[in-house]
């Protein structure tokens, strides 16, 4: 393509996005795109502009250095995707993105005025934590077909079925009765026995005497869509529902190839055709999930030996072992006992060379394992405990709780917490519908876009690291390792499983096959 035409196309593309190029920058860009065919040019320019917008820009005048960095990012060799096949991402390594309401997009932390996260959070971090939870749900709800404003000139029947979200400030500012209002807010109990709805603009007292609850577990500190009428400073609720969920494909259609999940890839692995091909070709790949692996129990170790013997001819890609790793928590000898138990486990693994050399082992700590209290995200088991095991089993990773696993284009979130009981105990009203508890539970987690939609006194969180507990965009597989009965359910194109407590459920565990996204229930009882 003629350099002048190329230059003109590039300038126009940048101008359409509100960006201007300096002379040196356009000269460099024209040279870099010289070998690109006319058919590919538009796609390539869009990728470069996206990469430019991801950088911290001081103005809309783009320098050469910014364009150089963007071109370099877009021209990375496809062969580099080989190192992106399998990655374990700890909670403290997850990238943080902040939603910008003005630009209607997620910005990396560096492009915002937020400080770097710190375990010793400030009051601002605590307020920001709830504000960000609200903002994510608000933008998701606003884009849902029921809440998008009707198109001008549309049929009256179409516009009649649309809803409009109101803020609490709007309600409180009215001196007359407001009928049929829908508000997105968080349920709080500011006074004992009295529930309030809270959003960034204010709080309003609720009257729940006539409220109908749709399916889900409605706990304090969860976000709801409340429908009702407002009179005399009280919001009388007719119905409670959760914010609508959204498949990850829909989220990515709006926000492009941002890598929300984490890992070495600059862009979302979902866009990689090469990784997708590898995933489909490797039909033997499997992930084995176990929870409550009590390594101090002889019977548990025997069952693990039987399992390894069974899998030895065709070793799984990965064993994900979740805590607690001791049946007797705490105590002065717990650390030494756990070191000895891990030594015994290493002995068993070494008995099966195929598994020892081929399979990866991921250890996710449980709530009663040695560590820093019960605040989430929880760091890995201490190196002093795991050192010897890691030397003997090199393909082992001791990670955080929760953690994320990326395999080819699939995203897996693993969380070890006895969450079902906690959420049932803290319900504003226990569900009366015939839906099974796991269905209520999974719907709640995905609707909230968060792993722990509970008050902080029930499930404490490091305020500045709350983003590490997000379930947005929705992963392909969500593993909630809970002592509740094992279950497998699908919601919003997300497969949700609970392997159950290994010793308490007759030695049951779950096996996931990424090539066809299926889960197999397995049990070692009777062996």
Curated annotation (Swiss-Prot):
Lineage at the top is: Eukaryota, Metazoa, Chordata, Craniata, Vertebrata
Q: Name one GO biological process term.
A: error-prone translesion synthesis
* Compartment annotation: Nucleus
- Which keywords annotate this record? DNA replication, DNA-binding, Nucleus
Q: Name one GO cellular component term.
A: epsilon DNA polymerase complex
Q: Which species is this UniProt entry from?
A: Homo sapiens
**Which miscellaneous remark does the UniProt record hold?**
In eukaryotes there are five DNA polymerases: alpha, beta, gamma, delta, and epsilon which are responsible for different reactions of DNA synthesis.
List the Gene3D superfamilies: 1.10.8.60, 3.60.21.60
Which cysteines in this chain are paired by disulphide bridges?
Answer: none
Q: What is this protein called?
A: DNA polymerase epsilon subunit 2
Q: What is an example of a Pfam family matching this protein?
A: Dpoe2NT
Instruction: Explain the purpose of this protein.
Output: Accessory component of the DNA polymerase epsilon complex. Participates in DNA repair and in chromosomal DNA replication.
Give the UniProt family note: Belongs to the DNA polymerase epsilon subunit B family.
MF annotations from Gene Ontology: DNA binding; DNA-directed DNA polymerase activity
Does the keyword Cell inner membrane feature in the UniProt annotation? no
Q: What is annotated about its quaternary structure and interactions? A: Component of the DNA polymerase epsilon complex consisting of four subunits: the catalytic subunit POLE and the accessory subunits POLE2, POLE3 and POLE4.
- Where's it mainly located? nucleus
Q: Does the keyword Nucleus apply?
A: yes
């Amino acid at each position: 393509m003629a350099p002048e035409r190329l230059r003109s196309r590039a300038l126009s593309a940048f101008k359409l996005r509100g960006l201007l190029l300096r002379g040196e920058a356009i000269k460099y860009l024209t040279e870099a795109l010289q070998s690109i065919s006319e058919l590919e040019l538009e796609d390539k320019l869009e990728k470069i502009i996206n990469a430019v917008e991801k950088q911290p820009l001081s103005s809309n005048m783009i320098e050469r250095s910014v364009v150089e960095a963007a071109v370099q990012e877009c021209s990375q060799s496809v062969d580099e995707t080989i190192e992106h096949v399998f990655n374990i991402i700890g909670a403290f390594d997850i990238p943080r993105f902040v939603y910008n309401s003005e630009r209607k997009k997620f910005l990396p932390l560096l492009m915002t005025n937020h400080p770097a996260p710190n375990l010793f959070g400030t009051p601002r971090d605590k307020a920001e934590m709830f504000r960000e939870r609200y903002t994510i749900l608000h933008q998701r709800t606003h884009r849902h077909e029921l809440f998008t404003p009707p198109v001008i000139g549309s049929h009256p029947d179409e516009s009649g079925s649309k809803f409009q979200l109101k803020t609490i400030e709007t309600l409180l500012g009215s001196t007359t009765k407001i009928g049929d209002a829908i508000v997105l807010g968080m349920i709080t109990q500011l006074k004992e026995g009295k529930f309030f709805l809270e959003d960034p603009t204010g709080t309003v007292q609720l009257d729940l005497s006539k409220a109908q609850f749709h399916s889900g577990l409605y706990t304090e500190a969860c976000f709801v869509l409340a429908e009702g009428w407002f009179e005399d400073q009280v919001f009388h609720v007719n119905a409670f529902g959760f914010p609508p969920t959204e498949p990850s494909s829909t989220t990515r259609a709006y926000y492009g190839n941002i890598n929300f999940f984490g890992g070495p890839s600059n862009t979302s692995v979902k866009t990689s055709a090469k990784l997708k091909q590898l995933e489909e070709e490797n039909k033997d790949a499997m992930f084995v999930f176990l929870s409550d692996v009590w390594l101090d129990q002889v019977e548990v170790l025997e069952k693990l030996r039987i399992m390894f013997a069974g899998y030895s001819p065709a070793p799984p890609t990965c064993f994900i072992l979740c805590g607690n790793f001791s049946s007797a928590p705490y105590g002065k000898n717990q650390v030494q006992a756990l070191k000895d138990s891990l030594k015994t486990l290493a002995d068993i693994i070494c008995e099966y060379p195929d598994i020892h050399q081929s399979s990866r082992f991921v250890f996710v700590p449980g709530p009663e394992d040695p560590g820093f209290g019960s605040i989430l995200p929880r760091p890995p088991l201490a190196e002093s405990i795991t050192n010897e095991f890691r030397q003997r089993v090199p393909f082992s990773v001791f990670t955080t709780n929760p953690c994320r696993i990326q395999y080819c284009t699939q995203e897996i979130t693993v969380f070890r917490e006895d969450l079902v009981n906690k959420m049932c105990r803290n319900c504003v009203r226990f569900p009366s519908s015939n839906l099974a508890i796991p269905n209520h539970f999974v719907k709640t987690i995905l609707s909230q876009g968060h792993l722990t939609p509970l008050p902080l006194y029930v499930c404490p969180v490091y305020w500045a690291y709350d983003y590490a507990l997000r379930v947005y965009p929705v992963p392909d597989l969500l593993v909630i390792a809970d002592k509740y009965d094992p279950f497998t359910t699908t919601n919003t194109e997300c497969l949700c499983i609970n392997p159950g407590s290994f010793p308490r459920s007759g030695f049951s565990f779950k096996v996931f096959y990424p090539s066809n996204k299926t889960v197999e229930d397995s049990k070692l009882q009777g062996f």
